[in-house]
């Protein structure tokens, strides 16, 4: 079938901000789709609210709208651009839900817009739990016994019939949001209430729990001619009951017999044909390990997280081909871009094993509930490829960057028996390490299988790894065992620990017997056809398939798995750096291990190595490629942390030298540099013991800001207001010693300002100055950033430009740097300098039209800013206002405090752009998911220090028609200021409390600032959690509340009675 010529313009809907359950995989899918459609000659219009994505670059579509993905804004874009069709299946759950909303509102009919890929009927059949169950019954495919419920009474009726445990699956939600396994009535009430609130159609499926079955996924494709094929099948190591996004996954499946594989394959193809999906689809199935019985769990009628994994695991570009199928091309017409000779209907064949391990943010959220279930909690994932499951697993473990280079975690090894049993029987994010610890203590694989239902095959493989560990320890420096260990995926670092030598000694041992990895090609066809894919993985075999080209090359280190503090922004910079290297005439090589990202699309670079970002693994690639140098500025702290080890092995680090990087990151060296440059910073010192920290704090005065040196995302950073609190921090939050000092600074409660700059060593370009809405003390990644700065005087701006220029040249920066300042009146203090790319670089690149990573890379390669066409100094400011608003995933992480502070908590961001600050903020808030009510009730409960400021906010809320509700202390303050207020009871009082009002939907906005003391802290935490779980916006900073208020005021109107009166009535606004 030829591609369709009756459509000219296609609207692609993106997935919006990064949240748990919907991450960088949709930037990868959307980028592929836009390029694929443009390749076919279509005019592409894109809407996405996330500025930190490659897909929102101007080159990716004919028209790019960085606007909220809401019915209002997408309808406006459709009416303006008049697309012939929309493609929603590459924008995750956001894209599907938006297509359904547009249809329900009549916009698609009104503007005569066709839905491509998966039609609305198929979306409804797959996403609506009742329609899906009915379809499976029609097809004769088994689903677990279930019922559709719309309220708690219906849930009780179902449970009375089949008993506990039951699984709750809300309709039209992402990453299992609101769902879970319920073992008792209390869990049922909590989960069903949450699920019904989060489901856009107030619908949940309750089903009999089949926890313990094997969970298997099939990634399938279908075209308009009803050709269908399996791209990849994947097996979850964890059985049914844990969300697939939180499971360790292996591809291809390892424990299915041929009969089981074919049985489930046939079911998957039958389902995609029944749904008449044109494109990609993910089918999840549960298989009884003791029989051939199976159930269909669910179908994602779109490109998904698993699609990205399947694409990277096989090399088969699912999103690219799904876009071509959506416009009428068929699988037997489209060439497989991997081989260039075969067609897309050939099913990929793997002669290697792929392991995926999820990455969690529990290092940031120590109080979070780490228990895994049907609601996803991982922020990202890593993938590794090997010739065996053991090798792939161990490579994936060391890719996680959790301080483990092997299946060995200190907490697991030192756990008492009760903790060990709990961690094995009730799975958390680190269960893999506790399984290894149990095997070391002598538990059998049969015992572990009985407790976990993990297949004996995987437990057997783990036990063989532990057995090999023991032989390694018993035979120090034995060459045969060394070779066996390397083939099994063991790292030099772990072997060095076993033999009590350093890593270099292990390397020398390997060198003596020429024991080095070779690189194999990912070619989709197990070498059956000739392939030229520049996509490689390492393994210890004989034949090497990666050969160095004659062209000079540059290696760019990626940023690894997405986590809080190091997100998709760094992948954005990595991709742009690669393109700049290619433009400069060099071969660009990427090393990375994240299957979700654009950077690990093999078509982006000249060569892709899918490898752990450890010194050993990176050095192996360097030895074979012999690059001109390595770029570390764009891979976040992951890449920066490797720089020292690489330099010591003679590798040239391109850009800012190691010594100068250390001067920026090492506190004492940085203080000396600031002294020489005569740039002020808040008073502070480095402490290497608890006593020293107390002395420093006493000298400079409380409150103080404390943080460990060399961190990203403000990990373990805190504002401390007393000696008691400081002692608690020093003994609980950090392990302080001379090798790991802690920084103690005077806390300046001023206005925070952020600057990204590029330096060529002589000239410094400053694309823009951003101010934060929230005052200093809230992490920059969690603050609302505004460009151009609205509240800074010309004098302050000139000072910032002067300090930035002095810092860049004084620290000998070559490439990018990010500086954070605090402004107190007209005084400017530098807080920190990061000699690398930052999370604001994509945002600033988009709005200033200065491609920062590209320009910085050209500078790193030796060019200067003036020759590249840039004038040093501050770039001319834009007339429009741009805001970057953080997005949080608190609804997925129960028990996490939503209050903002120096430790970063946001998972993503959105952009708002308009002619006024209020309009830009409105777009930003709406795009972030904040519900903006024009009237309602504001609950105020604030700390004593904030009460005076809260009075002014309450007056303004009252003036535009909001009702004010407050707890006793805050209410008294408001009453004294003659502000009408309803006093509500605190938590624990016998009558109806503020929690009841929140749960009953009587509150539209909560403003709650942190109060010290155990009881107020506990109450504040409960208020904030209840607000999040009931979908109510909660502000823990008065600055954020004021920003929301500004927006609401801008949307209100003056209302004044025309009656004349001797007593002049105050104006009211609503």
Curated annotation (Swiss-Prot):
InterPro entries: ATP-grasp (IPR011761), ATP_grasp_subdomain_1 (IPR013815), CarbamoylP_synth_lsu (IPR006275), CarbamoylP_synth_lsu_oligo (IPR005480), CarbamoylP_synth_lsu_oligo_sf (IPR036897), CbamoylP_synth_lsu-like_ATP-bd (IPR005479), CbamoylP_synth_lsu_CPSase_dom (IPR005483), MGS-like_dom (IPR011607). Mn(2+) 2 binds at residues 298, 300. Mn(2+) 1 binds at residues 284, 298. It catalyses: hydrogencarbonate + L-glutamine + 2 ATP + H2O = carbamoyl phosphate + L-glutamate + 2 ADP + phosphate + 2 H(+). Binds 4 Mg(2+) or Mn(2+) ions per subunit. Mg(2+) 3 binds at residues 820, 832. Pathway: Amino-acid biosynthesis; L-arginine biosynthesis; carbamoyl phosphate from bicarbonate: step 1/1; Pyrimidine metabolism; UMP biosynthesis via de novo pathway; (S)-dihydroorotate from bicarbonate: step 1/3. Residues 930-1070 are annotated as: Allosteric domain. ATP 2 binds at residues 707, 746, 748, 752, 777-780, 820, 832. One of its GO terms (biological process) is L-arginine biosynthetic process. It is an enzyme of class 6 (ligase). ATP 1 binds at residues 129, 169, 175-176, 208, 210, 215, 241-243, 284, 298. The keyword Transport does not apply. Mg(2+) 1 binds at residues 284, 298. Residues 133-327, 671-861 form the ATP-grasp domain. Belongs to the CarB family. This is Carbamoyl phosphate synthase large chain. It comes from Listeria monocytogenes serotype 4b (strain CLIP80459).
């Amino acid at each position: 079938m030829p591609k369709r010529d009756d459509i000219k313009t296609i609207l692609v809907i993106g997935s919006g901000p990064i949240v748990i359950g919907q991450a960088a995989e949709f930037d990868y899918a959307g980028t592929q789709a836009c390029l694929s459609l443009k390749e076919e000659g279509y005019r592409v219009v894109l809407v996405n609210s996330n500025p930190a994505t490659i897909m929102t670059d101007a080159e990716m579509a004919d028209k790019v709208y960085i606007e909220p993905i809401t019915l209002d804004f997408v309808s406006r874009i459709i009416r303006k651009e008049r697309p012939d069709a929309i493609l929603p299946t590459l924008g995750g759950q956001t894209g599907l839900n938006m297509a359904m909303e547009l249809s329900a509102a009549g916009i698609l009919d009104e503007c005569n817009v066709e839905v491509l890929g998966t039609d609305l009927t198929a979306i409804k059949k797959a996403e609506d739990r009742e329609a899906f169950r009915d379809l499976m019954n029609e097809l004769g495919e088994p689903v677990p016994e279930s019922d559709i419920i719309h309220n708690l009474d219906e849930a009780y009726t179902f449970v009375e019939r089949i008993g506990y445990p039951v699984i709750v699956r809300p309709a039209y939600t992402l990453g299992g949001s609101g769902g879970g396994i319920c073992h008792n009535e209390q869990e049922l009430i909590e989960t069903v209430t949450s699920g019904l609130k989060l489901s856009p159609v107030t619908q949940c499926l309750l089903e009999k729990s089949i926890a313990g079955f094997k969970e298997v996924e099939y990634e399938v494709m279908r075209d308009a001619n009803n050709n269908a094929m399996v791209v990849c099948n994947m097996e979850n190591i964890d059985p049914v009951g844990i969300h697939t996004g939180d499971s360790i996954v292996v591809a291809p499946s390892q424990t299915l017999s041929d009969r089981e594989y074919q049985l489930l394959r046939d079911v998957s193809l039958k389902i995609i044909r029944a749904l008449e999906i044109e494109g990609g689809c993910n089918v999840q199935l549960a298989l009884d390990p003791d029989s051939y019985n199976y159930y269909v769990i669910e179908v994602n009628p779109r490109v998904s997280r698993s699609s990205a994994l399947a694409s990277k695991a096989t090399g088969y570009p699912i999103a690219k081909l799904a876009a071509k199928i959506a416009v009428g091309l068929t699988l037997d017409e489209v060439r497989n871009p991997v081989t260039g000779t075969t067609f897309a209907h050939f099913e990929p064949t793997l002669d290697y094993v792929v392991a995926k391990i999820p990455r969690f943010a529990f290092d940031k959220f120590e109080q979070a509930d780490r228990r895994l279930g049907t609601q996803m909690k991982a922020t990202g994932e890593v993938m590794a490829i090997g010739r065996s499951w053991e090798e792939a697993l161990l490579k994936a473990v060391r890719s996680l960057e959790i301080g483990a280079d092997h299946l060995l975690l200190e907490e697991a090894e030192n756990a008492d028996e009760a903790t060990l049993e709990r961690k094995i029987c009730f799975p958390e994010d680190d269960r893999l390490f506790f399984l290894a610890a149990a095997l070391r203590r002598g538990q059998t694989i049969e015992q572990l299988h009985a407790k976990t239902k993990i297949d004996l095959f995987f437990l057997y493989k783990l036990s063989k790894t532990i057995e090999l560990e023991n032989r390694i320890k018993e035979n120090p420096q034995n060459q045969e065992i060394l070779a066996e260990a390397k083939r099994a995926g063991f790292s030099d670092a772990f072997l060095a620990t076993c033999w009590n030598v350093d890593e270099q000694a292990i390397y020398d041992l390997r060198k003596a017997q020429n024991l080095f990895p070779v690189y194999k090609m990912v070619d989709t066809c197990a070498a059956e056809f000739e392939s030229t894919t520049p996509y490689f993985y390492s393994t210890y075999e004989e034949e090497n398939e990666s050969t160095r080209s004659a062209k000079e090359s540059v290696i760019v280190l990626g940023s690894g798995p997405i986590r809080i503090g190091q997100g998709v922004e760094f992948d954005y910079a990595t991709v742009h750096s690669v393109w700049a290297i290619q433009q400069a005439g060099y071969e660009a090589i990427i090393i990375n291990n994240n299957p979700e990202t654009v950077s690990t699309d093999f078509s982006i670079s000249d060569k892709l190595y899918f490898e752990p970002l450890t010194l050993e693994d990176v050095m192996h690639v360097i030895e074979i490629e012999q690059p001109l140098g390595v770029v570390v500025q764009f891979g976040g702290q992951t890449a920066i942390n490797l720089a020292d080890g690489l330099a010591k092995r003679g590798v040239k680090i391109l850009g800012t030298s190691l010594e100068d990087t250390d001067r920026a990151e090492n506190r004492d060296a940085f203080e000396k540099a600031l002294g020489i440059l005569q740039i002020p910073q808040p008073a502070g010192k480095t402490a290497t013991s608890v006593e020293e920290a107390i002395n420093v704090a006493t000298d400079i005065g409380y409150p103080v800001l404390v943080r460990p040196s060399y961190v990203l995302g403000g990990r373990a950073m805190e504002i401390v207001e007393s000696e008691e609190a400081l002692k608690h921090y020093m003994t609980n939050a950090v392990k302080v010693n001379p090798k790991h000092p802690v920084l103690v600074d005077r806390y300046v409660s001023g206005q925070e300002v952020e600057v990204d700059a590029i330096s060529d060593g002589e000239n410094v370009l400053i694309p823009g100055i951003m101010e934060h809405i929230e005052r200093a003390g809230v992490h920059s990644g969690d603050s609302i950033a505004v460009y151009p700065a609205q509240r800074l005087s010309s004098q302050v701006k000139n000072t910032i430009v002067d300090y930035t220029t002095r810092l860049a040249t004084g620290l000998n920066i070559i490439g990018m740097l990010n500086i954070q300042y605090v402004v107190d009146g007209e005084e400017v203090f530098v807080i920190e300098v990061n000699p690398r790319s930052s999370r604001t670089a994509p945002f600033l690149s988009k709005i200033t039209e200065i491609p920062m990573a590209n320009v910085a890379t050209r500078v790193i390669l030796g060019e200067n800013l003036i020759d590249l066409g840039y004038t040093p100094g501050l770039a001319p400011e834009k007339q429009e206002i741009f805001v970057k608003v953080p997005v949080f995933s608190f609804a997925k992480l129960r028990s996490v405090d939503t209050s903002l502070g120096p430790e970063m908590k946001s998972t993503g961001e959105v952009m708002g752009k308009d002619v006024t600050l209020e309009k830009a903020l409105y777009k930003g808030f709406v795009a972030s998911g904040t519900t903006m009510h024009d009237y309602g009730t504001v609950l105020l409960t604030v700390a004593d220090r904030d009460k005076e400021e809260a009075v002014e906010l309450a007056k303004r809320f009252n003036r535009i028609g909001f009702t004010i509700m407050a707890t006793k202390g805050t209410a008294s303050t408001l009453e004294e200021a003659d502000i009408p207020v309803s006093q509500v009871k605190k938590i624990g009082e016998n009558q109806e409390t503020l929690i009841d009002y929140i749960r009953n939907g009587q509150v539209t906005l909560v403003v709650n600032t942190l109060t010290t003391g155990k009881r107020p802290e506990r109450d504040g935490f409960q208020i904030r959690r209840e607000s999040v779980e009931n979908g109510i916006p909660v502000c823990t900073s008065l600055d954020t509340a004021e920003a929301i208020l500004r927006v609401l005021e801008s949307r209100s109107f003056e209302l004044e009675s025309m009656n004349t009166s001797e007593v002049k009535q105050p104006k009211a606004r609503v």
